[in-house]
């Protein structure tokens, strides 16, 4: 007999990078569907303001995902406030565009820049995964044995990295690579792990580009030939949460784009 689809209503979700972009859109959707959201983002973000806009079912938990102490404090705050954590959505990340070697400038990619991207995107994601798994593991399992769901954000750059994306592609490729082994690690305690690899989305990073550039990027998407809407990412997050058999998978959400150099 198939397991019943689980509603997001009543669930508690921690969302990193929750003050803007994909993270904020996810928080809005989940709260709108009756869930509670904890916006985990850096202290100088708009997290406090955005949480207040979303009402009593949302709070801001300031933390840098690279800090064990800060993330643990944020998770403790969430559990003390709401009693448990059912879902974690990892959206926090940064990007740089630096060539490995720039011939005209006679300039090499600095290790500091490479390490910074890896530290936030890859290590930061794993830091949240490992700590939130410890909290979810204390939940009472549902009828299907599930205690929690962890959803990570990679990128199509994990598969078709562009010029200047060595660090970014490495960080997102790492997230893709650790999805299955972590899903297997956490399977015995009933925690699912899924990664979404978005294509070109209308996030703050892209909306600041000139119209000409954005229109060109949108034209590269086969269908629909436009930038993705963050609400579409949030919709997929909800679908992942609600489908109990979806585990250990990386899902491309990209309008069938396959980036060329």
Swiss-Prot record:
> Reaction catalysed?
a (3S)-3-hydroxyacyl-CoA + NAD(+) = a 3-oxoacyl-CoA + NADH + H(+); (2S,3S)-3-hydroxy-2-methylbutanoyl-CoA + NAD(+) = 2-methyl-3-oxobutanoyl-CoA + NADH + H(+); testosterone + NAD(+) = androst-4-ene-3,17-dione + NADH + H(+); 5alpha-androstane-3alpha,17beta-diol + NAD(+) = 17beta-hydroxy-5alpha-androstan-3-one + NADH + H(+)
Does the UniProt entry include the keyword Oxidoreductase?
A: yes
Instruction: Point out residues bearing the modification N6-succinyllysine.
Output: 53, 212
Which residues does the record give as substrate binding sites? 155
**Post-translational modification N6-acetyllysine, affected residues:** 53, 69, 99, 105, 212
Keywords linked to the UniProt accession: Acetylation, Fatty acid metabolism, Lipid metabolism, Mitochondrion, Mitochondrion nucleoid, NAD, Oxidoreductase, Steroid metabolism, tRNA processing
Sites of N-acetylalanine modification: 2
Q: Where in the cell is it found?
A: Mitochondrion; Mitochondrion matrix, Mitochondrion nucleoid
Mention any one GO cellular component term assigned to this protein in its UniProt record.
mitochondrial nucleoid
Record GO biological process: androgen metabolic process; bile acid biosynthetic process; brexanolone metabolic process; C21-steroid hormone metabolic process; estrogen metabolic process; fatty acid beta-oxidation; fatty acid metabolic process; isoleucine catabolic process
Q: Which coarse location class applies to the principal site listed for this UniProt protein?
A: mitochondrion
**Pfam families (alphabetical):** adh_short (PF00106)
Q: Where does NAD(+) bind?
A: 20, 22, 41, 65, 91, 168, 172, 201, 203
Supply one GO molecular-function term.
steroid binding
Q: Does the keyword Repeat apply?
A: no
* Annotated EC: 1.1.1.35, 1.1.1.62, 1.1.1.239, 1.1.1.178
Identify the InterPro entries for this entry: NAD(P)-bd_dom_sf, Sc_DH/Rdtase_CS, SDR_fam
Organism's domain of life?
Eukaryota
- Kindly tell me the pathway this chain contributes to: Amino-acid degradation; L-isoleucine degradation; Lipid metabolism; fatty acid beta-oxidation; Steroid metabolism; Lipid metabolism; bile acid biosynthesis
Location of the active site:
168
* Residue runs in coiled coils: none
Sequence similarity: Belongs to the short-chain dehydrogenases/reductases (SDR) family.
Query: Tell me, what does this protein do in biology?
Result: Mitochondrial dehydrogenase involved in pathways of fatty acid, branched-chain amino acid and steroid metabolism. Acts as (S)-3-hydroxyacyl-CoA dehydrogenase in mitochondrial fatty acid beta-oxidation, a major degradation pathway of fatty acids. Catalyzes the third step in the beta-oxidation cycle, namely the reversible conversion of (S)-3-hydroxyacyl-CoA to 3-ketoacyl-CoA. Preferentially accepts straight medium- and short-chain acyl-CoA substrates with highest efficiency for (3S)-hydroxybutanoyl-CoA. In addition to mitochondrial dehydrogenase activity, moonlights as a component of mitochondrial ribonuclease P, a complex that cleaves tRNA molecules in their 5'-ends. Together with TRMT10C/MRPP1, forms a subcomplex of the mitochondrial ribonuclease P, named MRPP1-MRPP2 subcomplex, which displays functions that are independent of the ribonuclease P activity. The MRPP1-MRPP2 subcomplex catalyzes the formation of N(1)-methylguanine and N(1)-methyladenine at position 9 (m1G9 and m1A9, respectively) in tRNAs; HSD17B10/MRPP2 acting as a non-catalytic subunit.
Share what the entry says about its subunit structure, partners included. Answer: Homotetramer. Component of mitochondrial ribonuclease P, a complex composed of TRMT10C/MRPP1, HSD17B10/MRPP2 and PRORP/MRPP3. Interacts with TRMT10C/MRPP1; forming the MRPP1-MRPP2 subcomplex of the mitochondrial ribonuclease P complex.
Name of the protein in its database record? 3-hydroxyacyl-CoA dehydrogenase type-2
- Can you name the source organism? Rattus norvegicus (Rat)
Name of the encoding gene: Hsd17b10
